[in-house]
């Protein structure tokens, strides 16, 4: 599955870069995040609890940032598995300064297997875009204030 998108921010590109790599901010804004621990090798251990329609559960995985060109570009590698299935993804992130802040363009290739794959690429693509949009909006909010809004009710449950 291939996904892409962009998000605009009122903060400058350096502040955006720092926010995207700040462990405490990430713990607050990653949808369904129950645990995020930075290891010595630069890799994160992560535990997420997410649900799509009737398929929900816990995913345990790893995230690593590579190909860093601060504050312009990085590649995020993520993999995880749990009772609903497994996910492996590579996401390319490009950051740009703009007149009124910054912009992030992203594209992601993801392999999804197990029960969660039975939901279908069309639904999963919509869910992934929704979660990415929520993540980027919450990054903006986290930088503006310490409080993060609770997730809206939808077919997507964050436990």
Task: Specify the residue positions occupied by each region the protein language model found.
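Mobile acidic interaction elements
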Residues: 29, 35-37, 60, 68-73, ...
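Hydrophobic/aromatic beta-strand elements that line small-molecule binding cavities or substrate pockets
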Residues: 7, 34, 61-67, 78, ...
